[in-house]
Amino acid sequence: AVTCEAGILIADLEQAVRADQVVSGGQEILMYPSTRDIATIGGFIAGGYAGAGSVRNGILKDAGNVTMIRVVTLEESPQVIELHGADIQKVHHAYGTNGIITALTLRLKPAIDWVHHIGLFESYSDALRFGCEATIAIGSRIDAFLITAVERRIAPYYTASFGDRFPTNKDAVFSMVNPDHLSEWRVLLAKHGGTESM
């Protein structure tokens, strides 16, 4: 677990727990928003629900993902209180309307050097079928941190980053896959008519 102040950028927190060798190879936070590089962990807890990593680790409010939140209450004589267990839900996803989050404790897992992968499909339906089966397989035969179906109309927005790896005539599934499970991932991709572009 890691205890941190609410104002730390999620990207900085992730870098710190990966660098800390309390666990050989470092650790990683369980989930983060797509705005990881500019978002604070306190903002994510106050307004977030899920994100990259949720397909593997659940959502923020699931028991044990956040184990402590320290809050300054919004009352005439503010108090500093620490919430644990089910009491965390009193301020999680409340957008700061009932207290100011100043610190929190998050559960961690051993870090994995996730493989960023793009699978291309002839139809969005094929991409969704693949994504659904891959999601169901998590925990039994596949380990993935992210599985996101992306419709072809979005492809032009990725040209600068991905070039021809996401062409406008294909639908895609963006994913982060455990390298130890990549061969099984590729078998499942082929089963659904997908091709690997990254």
Named regions from a protein language model:
Residues A1-M198:
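Noncatalytic alpha-helical scaffold of FAD-dependent oxidoreductases
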